[in-house]
Amino acid sequence: MSRNFSMRAKVYLKPLVFFQIIDAYDRRPKGDNQVMGTLLGRNKEGHIEITNCFTVPHKEHSENKRIDLDMAYASEVLELNMFAYPNERVLGWFCTGKSVSRSASLIHDYYVRECCEGQPLHLLVDAALKNQRLSTRLYCAVEMGVPGGTKGLMFSLVPLEISNENSDLVALRCIEKQSQQQASKQMERFVPELAQVVDATRDMQHRLDLVLRYINDVLARKKKPDNVVGRSLYAALTAVPLLDSDKFRVMFNTNLRDMLMAITLSTMIKTQLEISEKLSCMQDQ
């Protein structure tokens, strides 16, 4: 094993990587049983964080179970990614499936040359969603064999932890809520992004009502004050800048206009791509 990697290192995975892999698996070409690609992220003194990924086209040979990667494509996409996210580095590769493939050793050799910060990691994702669960395992290759003889690689499991920030949790809760219940007819009239803002505002209003009710009960001596709750409320209040209602209204409306403009532009681009795709299909026919 590389001296730069420790089995005790903490590896964290961003939820965005899951969505990118699942999306690539759903959009895979006909005839392909799996998708694979490059894992990107940061490695700081044993704290490894997988934050991004991109797929790499490959060709499967059924006669010998060999897989050939399009290395030229991988190098070009990696170079473009470095312009957008200069802090991200290659950490390894991912693959969909139930078990480590026979070509994992050859793919490992390629990513050994690409990884500048330690041993490449191998993320295996079972995108078939067996039992409605996304099975995920992380491996690291370990050299094994007789000294002076033939050596091989054994892929050993590495502990993996899902890293969720506050912004990630908001999106995940929204996805979970939409997956568990159908949108009502009243909410269908809203733009989806605005409906999420309305739900978040209602939830915040409910939480504020609970806090105000607790404070009023403490002031009226109906409840015994709790120092832990008081310190938490103080930290929450001091974390928010003090703004009057007029400034807050202007700031909120400005951000809302920016969001509506982004929604409009993204809708126009989506429509243009759909029209372009239909025109290209008509020309092929």
UniProtKB/Swiss-Prot annotation:
Top-level division of the source organism's lineage: Eukaryota
Protein name: Eukaryotic translation initiation factor 3 subunit F-2
Subunit comment: Component of the eukaryotic translation initiation factor 3 (eIF-3) complex. The eIF-3 complex interacts with pix.
Record organism: Drosophila melanogaster (Fruit fly)
InterPro entries: eIF3f, EIF3F/CSN6-like_C, JAMM/MPN+_dom, MPN
Role description: Component of the eukaryotic translation initiation factor 3 (eIF-3) complex, which is involved in protein synthesis of a specialized repertoire of mRNAs and, together with other initiation factors, stimulates binding of mRNA and methionyl-tRNAi to the 40S ribosome. The eIF-3 complex specifically targets and initiates translation of a subset of mRNAs involved in cell proliferation.
Cellular compartment(s): Cytoplasm
HAMAP family (alphabetical): eIF3f
GO CC, any one term: eukaryotic translation initiation factor 3 complex
